[in-house]
Amino acid sequence: MKILDKLFNRKKDLPPEKETKPPTEFKPQPQIILEDKKFIENSLLFDGEWYCKTYGFGKYLDAANHYLKIGWREGKDPSPFFSTADYLKKNPDVAGGDMNPLLHFEKFGFKENRYRAEIEQVLPKILERHPECKTEMHNGLLRIRITNACNAKCRYCGVRCTFGEEKNHAMNPAWYYELCRPIYDKIGVVLITGGDAFFAKESYNYMKFMSENFPQITLMTESNGIAFNEKFQQLALKNLFKTHFSINASTPEIFAKSCWDSDDSATAKKMFPIMIRNIKNYLAKLEAEDKLCFAPDLSMVINKDNADDILDFVELALKLHAGFIVFFFDYTENDMSGEFFTNPAVARPAMKTLMELERVLAEKIIIYCRLWVPSGEAYDLQQEVESIPIAQLNSKYEKILKLAEGRCVLDEWKKRNEFRRKAGKIEFSLVDDIAPTLHLKQETDREICFAPWNEIDLYPDGRMDFCCWFEPTLNLKNFIEHDAAGKEFVDWDKVLNSFEYAFARYRILRDDFRGCQVCCPMNSVKSPVESITKYNVDRFRS
């Protein structure tokens, strides 16, 4: 099993054209299980109210259970948008397998592009019935991988480890220069990522193009810093980039041991000083223009080979005036679909240290460490950390506190927004500034993951969806049309209000995160920085 398969059942090679798949192999389902019922209840093609009214049942009938067990056998439809008889007629393998047709569609048919034309035909009526599943993007996020290629050899890189030949693919420049152009007016952040943001041939040209033509947009970059040379530094300085560098260690030796492929440690030891030098050069430019509030975020992936480097890494990050300090746990050493760390001897003490630092530094600089954390780990450790007197923690981390003197999360955030306002850029809330890709939107009486409503994630081969941690179900190639002059264009409203997007919204509104990465903090429908608010950062929202 490939590494990312542990997180979700990702299919890398979605066909650009819609094809009929071979018959599904499945066994008859003699008993109804709760999971099957959930598939029906949370289907955009099921309407319990319509079902009861149409077939004369009382309002107290468990409509999903009835259709799942009995109704489909009687030829009943789950809604006006899905025909039981028609689906079985067009899919004889399903008819012969004694499986509920809507359940089959949910589990198999959707991914196999079955019943596609029929759904597209009724999609306007579906969206009319469920307006909460329709959207018009506003200050959205476009995550764009202009290349999957990278100049590093990180041993835990998902692209390197699982993308096969696609790991070197670059996106057709016409896609981000022309096809994406109509959506830019609805975008607040363009996140340039993939392989390395600064490594593609078109990286500089694209960043310059965006800065000149869409100055209201904040460009966010994810990189190791190796290719972040003078021309990129000047461009980032002038246009207030939000930069993130994965440096992963405090020294070249630890970097080579814990991050880089072990068969090329000599190269790793040469690359690390280049990364640090580029960051320092950029910091000098920022400081000269009183823009240190835009200092890069720095991150580290924690594993067995660098867990004892956390404090030294934090010290280095503070010396480099890091905007935020971000930690991830190496998913190749843990089952991130489980509730607890696979390597607790290494990961658990590391997590406790991060929680202590999070508490000590909360108002000075944010330690962001709650991403890719098995769901059962944080609670007990949090209680331990809460029970420690703050004076004891301040004494324990006296050296780190000294390095953080004068830092203030609130002041730096306000200053960034002052610069953005003067430059005509969209301003950020504090939470959005910390985690532009992981935040919540208000939905009636609660908050919920913003991504299905306001994000597009685009890969070099055209695969796309609303989040890089959601199984891609669309392909840009299927949305390319031609105008009267033969010029290609994309109607982005059709993308954003496609059945796939609407379907995901409907499920997520019902706390059904099927297809999402199992350990995403959004699955709990809580802010990824909620824990920090315990330490008085909540007042920063005012």
What are the roles of these predicted feature ranges?
Residues 51, 87, 176, 255, ...:
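Hydrophobic/aromatic residues in well-formed alpha-helices
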Residues 11, 17-125:
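Charge-rich, low-complexity intrinsically disordered regions
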Residues 1-41, 114-133, 406, 412, ...:
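Membrane-proximal basic amphipathic "stem/tether" segments
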Residues 119-242, 253-270, 277, 333-358, ...:
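Conserved alpha-helical substructure of the radical SAM core
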